[in-house]
Amino acid sequence: MDTETSPLLSHNLSTREGIKQSTQGLLAHTIAKYPGTTAILLGILILLVIILIIVAIVYYNRAVDCNSNMPKPPPSYYVQQPEPHHHFPVFFRRRKNSTSQQSHIPSDEQLAELAHS
């Protein structure tokens, strides 16, 4: 069994080694021929990777913040409580009270009639 698979494995390994050597040779040749350009390209590549990591971290943090704020009680929760501690229901309740009180306050026309009489 080892004799059947070993030629295949050795062929695979030799192909991989050949590809690796040719790639390393090409890289070495490019770096030797254009050292400045290669350095600039590598620098840009590294900067892009760093920026991508920072953006991913910021995006992840915002997503976590949004998820932590998500579980809010439904609007019916505020209606069931006699005195809600949140501003909006109290604000609307005060407005309703003020509008109901305004019906007892005489209008400008009624005040003018009272002043003339």
From Swiss-Prot:
Topology class, membrane: Single-pass membrane protein
Biological processes annotated in GO: symbiont-mediated suppression of host innate immune response
One CC-aspect GO term: host cell endoplasmic reticulum membrane
Induction remark: Expressed in the late phase of the viral replicative cycle.
Gene source species: African swine fever virus (isolate Tick/South Africa/Pretoriuskop Pr4/1996)
Localization in the cell: Virion membrane; Host endoplasmic reticulum membrane
Domain of life: Viruses
UniProt-recorded name of the protein: Minor capsid protein p17
Glycosylation site list: N12, N97
Transmembrane segments: 39-59
Subunit composition and interactions: Interacts with the minor capsid protein M1249L and with the hexon capsid protein p72 capsomers; these interactions form a rigid zipper structure that stabilizes the capsomers. Interacts with host STING1.
Role according to the record: Together with the penton and the other minor capsid proteins (M1249L, p49), forms a complicated network immediately below the outer capsid shell, stabilizing the whole capsid. Three copies of p17 encircle each p72 capsomer in the inner capsid shell, anchoring p72 capsomers on the inner membrane. Required for the assembly of the capsid and icosahedral morphogenesis. Additionally, inhibits the host cGAS-STING pathway through its interaction with STING1 and subsequent interference of the recruitment of downstream components TBK1 and IKBKE.
Protein family membership: Belongs to the asfivirus minor capsid protein p17 family.
Keyword S-adenosyl-L-methionine applies: no
The keyword Glycoprotein belongs to this UniProt entry's keyword annotation: yes
Region (Disordered): 96-117
